[in-house]
Amino acid sequence: MRYSPAPAALYIRNRKRLTQKLKSNSLALFNSNDIMPTNADGTMAFRQNNNLLYLSGVDQEESILILCPDFPDKRYREVLFLRETSEQIAIWEGHKLTREEARHLSGVETVLWLSEFPKLFHHLMAMGGVLQVYLDTNEHYRADVVVETRNARFIDWCQKQYPLHTYERAAPLLAELRAVKQPEEIKQLQKACDITNLAFRRVLSFVNPGVKEYEIEAEFIHEFIRQGSRGFAYTPIIASGANACVLHYIENDQACKPGDVLLLDVGAEYGNYNADMTRCVPVSGRFTKRQKDVYQAVLRVMRGAMKLLRPGALYFEYHREVQRLMETELLKLKLIDKTDIKNQTKEKPVVAKYFMHGTGHHLGLDVHDVGNMYHKIVEGMVWTVEPGIYIREEKLGIRLENNVVIGKSGLLDLMKNIPLEAEEIEDLMNAR
């Protein structure tokens, strides 16, 4: 394993917090993700079901976790099932978790091979007084699930085998729990941000006119993997010039031109936790006056947004306050005038022409992490703060983004060590 996993105490605590939310006489079950195919016999890199990972720390395919907190025999209140390894598997695929390793990793005492699952599952359902079965689905508000998952196949099988049980949704419970980060999770997120910092500093000494966007992408991935990350937390955006005005530009195939500003929206993954950073740098090493004016405007909005982001705030009200900060800056930049402000509507705010996306999102095991955007922001949540100004007619896009932990009396900025001031970025680029 290239990353240091969180201690078992985290997963023990997470399971306890979940079981406290279950109804009496319940069973909850979580499957690992499938290994997804590409073409022929090719497969994508395995990525674990984050709910299973959150509850067990097990980062391996063909795994199942059962929680049955009211079962009479304490041995079976928590059971973890693993794929049984063999000499052939070890030769062809490498090491798989032993039962003892899984116990140490997860804190689950009863670890069995997957072949034992059918018999024990039936025993729990028949003899455990189980009334409710909590099953796992992807209910993220942005999800568009078109591929049948391992969890979906199990739901279909389970409901056919046990049609008279009551079925409950595990996803809302996990979303509520995962939205508030534990100290061990914040440590992993900080590590992802620290790796991102190292890579960004490397890139500052590399960017020059004529460099291809994908060459910059290569510099990031080199440093990420060198530092123990498995790579990018999401598809990177390396957008020079007019490309920065395309919010999800991912081709990364153009040359950086003299005088352009380069937008970098990248983050490292570490231990399945994710960083999400955006910085903008001058390709030639110095911002023009206009570029710096726009940069400073975005930076002021970012800092103003951080002051507004606090426990008890509601995201959509917070975002509207940030839009008002942006109005002031767009006026100063002469991108809008007072007539534009007077004629705007709630449905079509004047800032939307130049700032058309949200101010932030939950961050954690998922880049756009689970959590209800309509619920109040609470202490322990991790959010991105990412205002931007996109001036297509000037081929200029500036977005700045940091990751912050919501505290009782202020924010913990996980990216405080990543260069942000325009002058610091210029100095680092010209010190090479």
Predicted regions: what they are:
Residues 1-432:
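Active-site neighborhoods and metal-handling regions in enzymes and metal-associated proteins
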